[in-house]
Amino acid sequence: QRQMCIRDSPMAGSEKTGYENSSSSIIKGARYIITPTKETKPEKIEFMKQFASDVGMNPIVMDYHVHDKSVAAISHVPHLLSTALVHVVSDNDDEEKHMQLLAAGCFRDMSRVAASSPEMWEQICLTNSSAISNILEQYIEMLETIKDNIDKKTPGYVASLFEMSREYRNSLESRHPEH
């Protein structure tokens, strides 16, 4: 008899690790993604949905391809970008550590998840490597386009990029009113 397995992903977390940093409030209202296979029995899916609801999470059932691409874009690659940001700043900081001294809101916001568990994130990245690689390729292309336009001092390019990003980011508030 074949065993059934349902992949799940609680969309909640922190850069802090260990039991001493655990908190039940972190999952309250968070999305809980359930990715069944074609063989998964409906009652197993319902069990997982009920479990998620019982612990205060919002269950969402989706195809695993959609899940893998989505979490690569909204979680896995941002963790890698945060890590890359910290590496670039660290490599460019001077002996007096002026960059470290001046690091404030933007840098702190964007670098927070770089303090996450290296072991856990290595496993996550290796497990979802194909989707992550596809999203990273898009970032590389976008960064090259941004660099080209900044080098050329293209009028309006940077403003339009920020405007589009601001609109999408602000639209998240309607999807996540609790944050």
Spans of model-derived segments:
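Short, small-residue-biased leader/transition segments that mark boundaries at the very start
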Residues: 1-6
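Beta-strand->loop->alpha-helix junctions that form or flank phosphate-binding loops
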Residues: 7-10, 61-63
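Interdomain hinge/lid region at the active-site interface
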Residues: 96-165
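Internal alpha-helical scaffold of NAD(P)-dependent oxidoreductase catalytic cores
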Residues: 24-111
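Long, hydrophobic, amphipathic alpha-helical segments used as structural scaffolds
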Residues: 85-92, 147-154, 173-176
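Residue-level detector of flexible, active-site-proximal loop/helix-junction positions
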Residues: 10-12, 39, 66, 117
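Long, positively charged, glycine-interspersed low-complexity recognition regions
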Residues: 167-179
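Glycine-/Pro-rich loop/turn segments that contact NAD(P) or position catalytic residues
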Residues: 10-27, 33
